[in-house]
Amino acid sequence: MTRGSERISQFIQEGNTVEIACSENQESFFKTKFPSLIIHVTLPNNHIQIESGKGLFFKLGLRVFEFRANWKKEKNWLSKHLESNTYDLIYSDNRYGFYHPNVHSVLLTHQLTLPGPKLLLLLPQMVLNKNLNRFNEIEIPDFNEEPKLSGNLSRTTSRVTATFIGPLSQIKKNQSSTKKQLLLILSGPEPQRSRFAKDIVEETLQLGFPIVVAGESKSIPKSELVKELGYCNSAELKKLMNESSHIVCRSGYSTLMELATIGKKALLIPTSGQFEQECLAKYWEEQFNFPTANENEISTKDFVNYLNDSTHFERR
């Protein structure tokens, strides 16, 4: 959502009239960020993950049906909406069914190649490519030159013109002094998010290190060393990421773009079973020397090593 909102802000600054279509779980974010814009809360939840682990072939088949069902809902709503509304541009943030043949349609995504075993992903990738080819343009929020932030995920065989527009982040680097504290950025669905928060806080408290928790959680241990902030807007998160000496977070692509922008290493802990996060965490560990840890095997040693290492990061 944060990368999409960055492009929305750019469109508004250029003098364009913008309307937003989103799902219910995105409504609060967009209404807070853009209170004066028309917002259509009509789209399906876009949070479908390709999971690793046992029964992979069955899971992949199920995901193909889920993807296609979502894309059909997006396409049908848009087609009906355009019967009584006119637009010059349709800009889709990672929604592969949100396009129309009569309106110039642009897709914003870093994921043009699905992560995971190529042979098993042959059919899902063919389905994805078919939808990619229905857009007029693709914008990739990454650098054009190597090393890319998205690794192999942004490689494509699509016929559509793809342009690397650079990372999109609302969090900019500043020269504020850092505080000795660990910022834990929470994301993802419950109950996994609260279990993740509880494990991280417990391990950090064993080292006597101050911790700030950004994001909602139901089971954070109480301590004078723990500061719970709940939901943070982009301005608050910008300040926290710049001033915190250390950061622990998931390896979602939007978060990685923000880390690249502020030039700070974080301890990356991908959500267990989510191929894309696992793929990105491994790539950033190998390419950029970021520390990583397994969600199911978090240990004090992971934090000792990270807290004693430099957090300065330069892409090259």
Report each predicted region and the residues it spans.
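Conserved nucleotide-sugar phosphate-binding/catalytic loop shared by glycosyltransferases and other
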Residues: Q10-V64
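Alpha-helix C-terminal capping/helix-to-coil transition sites in glycosyltransferase folds
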Residues: S84-T86, N133-R134, Q181, N242-E243
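Nucleotide-sugar donor-binding patch of glycosyltransferase catalytic domains
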Residues: Y231, T261-D309
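A nucleotide-sugar donor-handling region in carbohydrate enzymes
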Residues: T109, P115-P191, E216-S217
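A donor-sugar binding/catalytic signature common to diverse glycosyltransferases
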Residues: E236-C279
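Short, polar loop motifs at secondary-structure junctions
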Residues: S23-S28, I90-G97, N144-E146, I211-P221
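Donor-nucleotide binding loops and adjacent catalytic segments primarily
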Residues: I8, T163-H246, N296
